[in-house]
Amino acid sequence: SNFLFTEDFTGTVFYPAMQGKEVIKEDEEEVWVRIGAGVEWDDFVAWTVQQGWGGVENLSFIPGHVGAAPVQNVGAYGIEAGERIGRVEAIDLDKAIRVEIAGKDCRFAYRDSIFKREWKNRYIITRVVFRLSKKPEFRLDYGALRSELEKMGGEVNLTNIRQAVIRIRRSKLPDVAEIPNAGSFFKNPVVSREQADRL
């Protein structure tokens, strides 16, 4: 969802700018929220933390928009967006119709989804529905995150986890207001057991 051009581009860029955040279903344990594809990803994460809903707090301060999250299956610090996506709403360009695609049908994998493969260029994502927890269970498997939380002191909660992630990210990346960037993007190599043993 973030473009960094190295030269002039003469084609057409379609930018889905759908806004909006709404609760569509909730019970004692969970809340389902429908978010416009054009909502800034970090604005969405900040909103969930303010509401006290867990599930995406480790994904704080990632640049981009909500509509790109299902394509890349964005992830950080032990959490991937696909774990929390209940469905994706989109326009099927082949059939010129609106569709709803269940999260389980998106074939989420490590930094991957069906939108990058079989369905590449077929759908325009308009909204994403996330399933969030009202009783969050924190993921603190990453040493850097645990260490930052310890340095900060205080209790482990959604707000402090978000702040710890932001502090870590700010220490690694330049301020986008000063040096425009698309954040960090990389994919850890996936190797066979045999290759890992050799290494």
Model region roles, listed by residue range:
Residues 1-94:
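Anion-binding (especially nucleotide phosphate/pyrophosphate-binding) glycine-rich loop
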Residues 98-199:
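Phosphate/pyrophosphate- and phosphate-bearing ligand-binding catalytic cores of soluble enzymes
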